[in-house]
């Protein structure tokens, strides 16, 4: 068009001369009209990755990838609730380490991803401070009836109840042991007749003997029929905690709790191991058109045209009007890769990343100082049935718990112990009589006020004991009496030999939480727990270290185009690109006329920003950018190898009360209560067995002479008299004389031998009933009751209040270098150079050879926007986003079965002496001794003052008692040591070979503190 302009001014058409040399480059023309659309150029090199689009919706889960190797353990996270043990998974294969990819630029923050699945529970964190007490929860379901409690303390005496009906006749009691010798009884029946005495006067009747001591109380009669309901008694003390019930059925899954308060940031985890290299991601969607490339350098001069004929030089024409702008040139080829830019300034701190994975358990540290007293642990499973323990003292009254919500009705439990009397209800209609309940434990008698006077009772008991009569002679030694009450606790005896291990005791109440124990040896990894209940989302943790690239997730669906972000700061100018490839030769243009050199123009306005240069090499890692939104959940990895056993979780909430345990054996007898009021006269009991013959009574005073006895037998002939001197010879035999008179009786002969005892006389009248024997021994324990059926599910408890902020964790190790920061702001524009001086206009000379090219004219107005190029190839894959926040926990699985009982521990050292036991039962009577020599009888001792001789057996009894008590104390101290003795003990972790046992020393220091020190065994 320039040449056309000159033609218009020419007066004549000269013959064209040969083409002159190429003139200097003319100033840029004005923009030309838009040309027709050019052909689609070849695809450009991939442009730089554009800014990330908004996060698309979460794509479907991809197939599970292979597991990477276990990362190194992070610091303990906050304690998760301990799930029940799950089944043990198989060990997966270790993935290969991938090579580290180049760091991509940080993309803009995406929208928050969907919550990821729950992470595995972290190791138990340090114990937080006690939280404030939560609000009272809704009432829990009614638990099954607990076992009968121990007898409570004496209650206030209630009003006298109505007199119950007379109970049925009790069975005859067992035969009691002989009582102590009573005072002398009245004279026995007459003996066999003595030898005749002189008849004496009748003696006066003896004084009545002293009344015998009251007999022992009879055995307890069966319960009478139920009396009318008494007025409600005061509320009793809280019973002892029942034994844990059998495992309940799994409760229904509770609704997800409201999110808890954001927790404080957890401590930084340690850097995880490098993950395995991810598989290549799927090809991304085709990118948008790349930015316009820099203009290529000038192409080489075209081939020289044929030389035209030289024209006559024309006069210099005036400067033509600015031509229309030319068509937009084809996009130049992309420039070579620019030099690496200088690192940008560090970006702002990113959001706190998720806590890293748990680290492996470290070696056991040295014992820490004794921690604060922990909360009570979870109630254990019921232990085996132990021997009956001694009755404990009544505990202090517990705080009243909140009322629980009514649960679903449970299955019928065993008959419970009688509860306290309720207030009297309205009188119901008469119903059929129900079955009698099991008798409850005997309560301690309570002190009370005077009851209302009852109706006139039957004949009262025997009157007050009279003054003691004269002391009778010592009777035969009676059988040993029943054992007395425990004496006062004696001093501790010398330590006895260790006794055999006793049967396990009943499960005690949970003790207060002890001080923190020494770190145990590392146990085997527990089975994988089932998914825990949903936890409340925690607060953002502190920023974690940049994790290794995750496996690529499946491509998400294309998201909607995000709103345009605010313009970023201008990047620094890239280094000058290398010259582009040589362009194709353009067609030779017509020769322009050389214009005179124009004066230097003023500096042009600042040009528009050039197109983006090609992607530079990866710069050094910048400071970590802000945390991106969580990427989509990666596929589930293979199961890792079995990890170390985690630390014990914090104590769980107290479980529901267990089902009632079996009835334990009867406890020891309580101290005898004060005597109850006199009962009504019972029916006459059955005839008792005949009592043993009592000891001989005191000899009575000599009675008066009896009436004369019958005539004695004729005495034996007397001795022959001495021979008289011979008489005179009588007459011849005379006639027989008359019978003489009866002679007087002869002198009484000596007393005959006593006759043999006569046959036993008829049975005497029935004697008075003997004293009541002592109560019989406790019967054998009843058969255990059937196990109660489990109660219905309880309703889920409310979420507890958020705990207080935990203590600050220890600082983690220094993190790895962060990802590159965003580019720094461009440096300030340098000052413009000074304008050169304007040259003077020279005279117009003849057309010389072409002058040097003038300075480049100012840029033309921008051309119209070219057509959209084809999409560039997909850019390199960006970094995986940070892990999303943990999703809500799944419902808790059913509780696993209880583990098998562990092996028995090694036998402990002998404890100090136990307290002495109660007096033992009396032994059987010994065999009868040989008869002693027959003694005489001396009444002289009756006149001497009577004193009881020392009991030769008593000293030996005391010795046995003290030994028993000392042994009992030693056993008691073995069972529950009081922590006042220093000493050494061993712990064998696997209870097998003793080579790995640990020896500990327990020291009680002077200030009351204690210390544990441990040493390895061989």
Swiss-Prot record:
Pfam families: Collagen. GO terms for cellular component: collagen trimer; extracellular matrix; extracellular space. The keyword Cytoplasm does not apply. Residues 13-30, 138-151, 665-677, 819-829 have a biased composition (Pro residues). Residues 1-10, 67-81, 865-876, 948-959 have a biased composition (Basic and acidic residues). One of its GO terms (molecular function) is extracellular matrix structural constituent conferring tensile strength. Residues 1-991 are annotated as: Disordered. PROSITE patterns: NC1_FIB. Keywords: Collagen, Disulfide bond, Extracellular matrix, Secreted. Residues 31-58, 126-136, 171-214, 223-261, 370-385, 424-442, 452-510, 543-558, 591-627, 641-663, 701-746, 775-795, 843-862, 889-925 have a biased composition (Low complexity). The keyword Transmembrane does not apply. Residues 963-973 have a biased composition (Polar residues). Residues 932-1018 form the Fibrillar collagen NC1 domain. Residues 152-170, 284-296, 568-577 have a biased composition (Gly residues). GO terms for biological process: extracellular matrix organization. Its main location: secreted. It is found in: Secreted, Extracellular space, Extracellular matrix. Belongs to the fibrillar collagen family. This is Collagen, type I, alpha 1a. It comes from Epinephelus costae (Goldblotch grouper).
């Amino acid at each position: 068009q320039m040449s056309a302009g000159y033609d218009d001014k020419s007066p004549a058409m000269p013959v064209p001369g040969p083409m002159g040399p190429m003139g200097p480059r003319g100033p840029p023309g004005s923009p030309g009209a838009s040309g027709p659309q050019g052909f689609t150029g070849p695809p450009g090199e991939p442009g730089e990755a554009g800014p990330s689009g908004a996060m698309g919706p979460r794509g479907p889960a991809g197939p599970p990838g292979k597991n990477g190797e276990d990362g190194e353990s992070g610091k303990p996270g906050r304690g998760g609730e301990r799930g029940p043990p799950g089944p043990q998974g198989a060990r997966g294969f270790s993935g290969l380490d991938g090579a580290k990819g180049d760091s991509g630029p940080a993309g803009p923050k995406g929208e928050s991803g969907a919550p990821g699945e729950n992470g595995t529970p972290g190791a138990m964190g340090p114990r937080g401070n006690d939280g404030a007490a939560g609000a009272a929860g809704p009432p829990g379901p009614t638990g099954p009836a607990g076992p009968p409690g121990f007898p409570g303390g004496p209650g206030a005496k209630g009003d006298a109840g109505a007199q119950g009906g007379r109970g049925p006749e009790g069975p005859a009691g067992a035969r009691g042991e002989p009582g102590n010798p009573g005072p002398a009884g009245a004279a026995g029946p007459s003996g066999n007749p003595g030898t005749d005495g002189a008849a004496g006067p009748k003696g006066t009747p003896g004084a009545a003997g002293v009344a015998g001591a009251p007999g022992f109380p009879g055995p307890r009669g069966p319960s009478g029929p139920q009396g009318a309901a008494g007025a409600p008694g005061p509320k009793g003390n809280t019973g002892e905690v029942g034994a844990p019930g059998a495992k309940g059925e799994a409760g229904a899954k509770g609704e997800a709790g409201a999110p808890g308060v954001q927790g404080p940031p957890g401590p930084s985890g340690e850097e995880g191991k490098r993950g395995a290299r991810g598989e290549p991601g799927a090809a991304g969607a085709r990118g948008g058109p790349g930015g316009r490339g820099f203009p290529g350098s000038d192409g080489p001069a075209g081939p020289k045209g044929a030389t035209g004929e030289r024209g006559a030089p024309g006069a210099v024409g005036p400067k033509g009007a600015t031509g229309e702008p030319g068509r937009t040139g084809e996009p130049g080829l992309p420039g070579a890769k620019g030099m690496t830019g200088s690192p940008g300034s560090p970006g702002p701190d990113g959001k706190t990343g998720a806590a890293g994975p748990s680290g492996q358990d470290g070696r056991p540290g040295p014992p820490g100082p004794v921690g604060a007293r922990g909360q009570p642990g979870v109630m254990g499973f019921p232990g085996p049935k132990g021997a009956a323990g001694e009755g404990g003292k009544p505990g202090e009254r517990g705080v009243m718990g909140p009322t629980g919500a009514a649960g679903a009705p449970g299955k019928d439990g065993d008959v419970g112990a009688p509860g306290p009397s309720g207030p009297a209800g309205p009188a119901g209609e008469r119903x059929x009589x129900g079955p009698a309940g099991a008798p409850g434990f005997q309560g301690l008698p309570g002190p009370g006020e005077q009851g209302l006077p009852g109706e006139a009772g039957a004949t009262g008991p025997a009157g007050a004991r009279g003054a003691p009569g004269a002391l009778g002679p010592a009777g035969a030694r009676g059988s040993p009496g029943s054992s007395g009450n425990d004496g006062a606790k004696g001093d501790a005896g010398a330590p006895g030999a260790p006794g055999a291990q006793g049967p396990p005791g009943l499960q005690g109440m949970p003790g207060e939480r002890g001080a923190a124990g020494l770190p145990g040896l590392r146990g085997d990894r527990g089975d994988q727990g089932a998914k825990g209940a949903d936890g409340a989302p925690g607060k953002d943790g502190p920023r974690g270290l940049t994790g290794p690239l995750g496996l690529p997730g499946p491509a998400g669906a294309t998201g909607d185009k995000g709103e345009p972000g605010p313009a970023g700061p201008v990047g620094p100018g890239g280094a000058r690109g290398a010259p582009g490839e040589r362009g194709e030769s353009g067609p030779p243009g017509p020769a322009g006329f050389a214009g005179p050199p124009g004066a230097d123009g003023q500096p042009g306005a600042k040009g528009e920003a050039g197109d983006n240069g090609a992607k530079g090499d990866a710069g050094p890692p910048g400071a970590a950018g802000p945390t991106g939104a969580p990427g989509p959940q990666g596929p589930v990895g293979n199961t890792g190898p079995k990890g170390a056993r985690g630390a014990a979780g914090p104590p769980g909430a107290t479980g529901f009360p267990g089902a009632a345990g079996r009835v334990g054996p009867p406890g020891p007898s309580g101290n005898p209560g004060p005597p109850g009021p006199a009962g009504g006269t019972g029916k006459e009991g059955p005839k008792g067995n005949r009592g043993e013959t009592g000891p001989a009574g005191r000899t009575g005073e000599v009675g008066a002479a009896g009436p004369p006895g019958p005539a004695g037998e004729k005495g034996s002939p007397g001795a022959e008299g001495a021979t008289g001197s011979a008489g005179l010879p009588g007459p011849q035999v005379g006639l027989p004389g008359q019978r003489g008179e009866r002679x007087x009786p002869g002198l009484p002969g000596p007393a005959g031998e006593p006759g043999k005892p006569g046959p036993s006389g008829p049975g005497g009248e029935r004697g008075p009933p003997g004293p009541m024997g002592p109560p019989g021994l406790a019967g054998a324990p009843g058969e255990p009751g059937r196990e109660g059926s489990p109660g219905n599910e309880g309703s889920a408890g409310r979420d507890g209040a958020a705990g207080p902020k935990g203590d600050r964790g220890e600082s983690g190790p220094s993190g790895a270098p962060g990802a590159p920061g965003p580019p720094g702001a461009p440096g300030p524009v340098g000052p413009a150079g000074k304008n050169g001086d304007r040259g003077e206009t020279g005279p117009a000379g003849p057309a010389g050879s072409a002058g040097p090219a003038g300075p480049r004219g100012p840029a033309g107005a921008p051309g119209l926007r070219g057509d959209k190029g084809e999409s560039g190839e997909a850019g390199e894959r960006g970094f995986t986003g940070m892990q999303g926040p943990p999703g809500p926990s799944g419902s808790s699985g059913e509780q696993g079965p209880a583990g098998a009982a562990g092996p028995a521990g090694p036998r402990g050292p002998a404890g100090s002496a136990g307290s002495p036991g109660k007096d033992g039962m009396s032994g059987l009577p010994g065999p009868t001794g040989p008869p002693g020599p027959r003694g005489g009888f001396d009444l002289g001792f009756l006149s001497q003052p009577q004193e009881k001789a020392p009991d030769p057996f008593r000293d030996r009894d005391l010795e046995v008692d003290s030994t028993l008590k000392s042994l009992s104390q030693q056993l008691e101290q073995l069972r529950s040591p009081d922590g006042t003795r220093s000493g050494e003990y061993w712990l064998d972790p696997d209870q097998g070979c003793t080579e790995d046992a640990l020896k500990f020393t327990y020291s009680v220091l002077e200030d009351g503190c204690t210390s544990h020190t441990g040493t390895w065994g061989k």
